[in-house]
């Protein structure tokens, strides 16, 4: 622990030694779970920075510590920067939120079913345009935005929320077209300089690499991450796109959090009108009933508190920005690893700073009827047992007891080297008897008959396998068959996807990803040789068979 800057009082209250110890304990627990090599956090109120803490290492090999000057990539928190710049142009009368994007980018084109209204700036800001998330298949924005013309849409603009990085890339091109300068210059002039964020860099380039903490990823990119997984330096890349290409420090980011706490007012006057900030923080309901997405801001209700902010992820970095307007407190967490949850940690620090005593981590409850013994129905594996324990659910296999981490409802990670290529997915049969899937292998409850599975067609058997690309954002995925139902499985799901999703055939030979008929993400396969597809196109970007 390196404590570089500390002020013990704020707003008439005191962060005592117990409060600081609680914050350090919360960080230590988060780092033990996710194992980022280094982390920094900042706490602020509307008037100034209250606390900066740094932990761990900016670079493991040399054991270089994180300092208050260390830069971290903040990922999609950059979307909040982009939204502020767009709304400034709205305040200036230079952008109409409800005008079609083509009004500002004449070459912008997205196939729309007949009768659908055009996509507007507001749709892009709120992730309701109905377009794909984007696979980041190129290092720049223009070609990815251009390529939207080759991808179908299945829902009308404004109809549903679907997170889209490429939508914010398009907003960056709109900013450049209207403001007449590169994105980095727009952000520096409109946000960084007025907020006195002089250490922040609005583009990730080789020129700043020496100031950046080294990003770390898991050594095995085709396995689910867990606390014992080895780390390796993440792929380095340059980027300057409006969905996330900013590097900053905890001190500088506290200045940006204050902009949120002050409703759009900076240290020397308003950056956003009250009306613009109200629009920014008025959310569109998303996939989580306790959360809503505004214009570059996520509003989330957690345990009786209303938080606003955004998370961010880059190749080798994670970030979390949370503000509690009612408590007049905000926190930024930056880390150079992709484990743990910086958004959750930021909320915990706010609670501690506001006088709450941190509670114990909730123990994942296992639904009663999921516990029991299971046998593989393909005669290719050993039986296993799922059981509840005081520390949460466990898997017992081959004389070992393995802790299960909940990824989603009825979806668990077994943190060892035997089961970490796929999650454990509990599914229910028609008579409500659970069965357990691990990739394409089914485990049946002991004493229960194995239900017959439909035989997959030759066409489906051809697509099953492991696919890769050299794209550092989404390096690989697998297709497995569960009877005649194909499933798409990621070790680390990209934006717009889940860890596991079923695939549904479409009339044109492609597959829709997931059960939502309005989901724009599609997958299709070609180049079948010796009964194996050699190439898969994931929402427009190629991946190649690797098994």
PLM regions and their residue ranges:
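Active-site SXXK
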Residues: 24-27, 41, 47, 70-98, ...
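Short, surface-exposed loop or secondary-structure junction motifs
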Residues: 48-60, 112-321, 325
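Short, conserved catalytic-motif segment at the N-terminal edge
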Residues: 14-74, 94-96, 103, 109-111, ...
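Peripheral terminal and inter-domain segments
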Residues: 2, 343-547
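A generic structural motif
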Residues: 56-58, 337, 493, 540
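Solvent-exposed, non-membrane alpha-helical residues enriched in polar/charged side chains
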Residues: 24, 28, 32, 87, ...
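Short, well-ordered beta-strand elements
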Residues: 309, 320-337, 434-438, 534-538
């Amino acid at each position: 622990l390196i404590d570089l800057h500390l002020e013990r009082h704020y707003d008439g209250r005191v962060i005592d030694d117990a409060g600081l110890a609680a914050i350090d304990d919360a960080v230590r627990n988060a780092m033990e779970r996710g194992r980022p090599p280094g982390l920094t956090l900042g706490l602020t109120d509307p008037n100034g920075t209250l606390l900066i803490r740094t932990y761990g290492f900016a670079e493991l090999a040399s054991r270089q510590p994180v300092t208050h000057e260390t830069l971290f990539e903040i990922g999609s928190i950059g979307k909040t920067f982009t939204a502020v710049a767009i709304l400034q142009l709205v305040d200036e009368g230079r952008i109409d939120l409800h005008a079609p994007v083509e009004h500002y980018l004449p070459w912008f084109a997205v196939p729309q079913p007949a009768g659908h209204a055009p996509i507007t700036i507001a749709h892009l800001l709120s992730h309701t345009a109905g377009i794909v998330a984007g696979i980041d298949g190129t290092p720049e924005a223009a070609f990815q935005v251009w390529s939207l013309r080759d991808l179908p849409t299945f829902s009308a603009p404004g109809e549903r929320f679907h997170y889209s990085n490429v939508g914010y890339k398009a907003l960056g091109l709109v900013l450049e077209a209207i403001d007449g300068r590169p994105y980095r210059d727009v952000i520096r002039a409109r946000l960084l300089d007025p907020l006195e964020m002089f250490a922040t860099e609005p583009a990730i380039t080789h020129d700043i690499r020496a100031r950046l903490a080294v990003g770390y990823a898991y050594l095995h990119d085709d396995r689910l991450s867990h606390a014992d997984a080895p780390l390796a330096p993440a792929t380095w890349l340059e980027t300057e796109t409006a969905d996330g290409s900013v590097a900053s420090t905890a001190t500088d980011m506290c200045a940006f959090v204050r902009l949120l706490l002050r409703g759009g007012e900076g240290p020397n006057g308003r950056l956003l009108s009250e009306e613009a900030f109200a629009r920014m923080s008025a959310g569109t309901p998303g996939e989580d009933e306790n959360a809503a997405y505004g214009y570059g801001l996520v509003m989330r209700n957690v345990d009786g508190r209303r938080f606003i902010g955004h998370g961010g992820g880059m190749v080798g970095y994670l970030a979390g920005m949370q503000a509690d307007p009612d408590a007049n407190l905000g926190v930024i967490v930056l880390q150079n690893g992709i484990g743990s949850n910086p958004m959750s940690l930021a909320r915990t620090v706010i609670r501690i700073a506001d006088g709450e005593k941190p509670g114990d981590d909730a123990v994942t409850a296992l639904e009663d009827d999921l516990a029991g013994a299971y046998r593989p129905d393909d005669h290719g594996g050993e039986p296993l047992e799922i059981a509840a324990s005081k520390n949460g659910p466990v898997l017992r296999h081959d004389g070992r007891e393995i802790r299960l981490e909940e990824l989603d409802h009825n979806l668990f990670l077994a943190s060892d080297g035997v089961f970490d290529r796929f999650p454990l997915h509990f599914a229910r049969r028609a008579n409500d008897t659970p069965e357990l899937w691990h990739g394409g292998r089914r485990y049946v409850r002991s004493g229960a008959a194995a239900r017959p599975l439909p035989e997959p067609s030759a066409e489906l058997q051809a697509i099953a396998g492991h696919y890769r690309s050299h794209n550092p954002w989404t390096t690989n995925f697998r297709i497995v068959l569960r009877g005649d139902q194909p499933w798409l499985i990621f070790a680390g799901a990209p934006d717009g996807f889940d860890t596991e999703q079923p695939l549904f055939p479409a009339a044109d030979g492609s597959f829709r990803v997931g059960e939502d008929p309005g989901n724009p993400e599609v997958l299709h396969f070609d180049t079948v040789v010796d009964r194996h597809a050699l190439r898969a196109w994931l929402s427009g970007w190629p991946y190649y068979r690797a098994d």
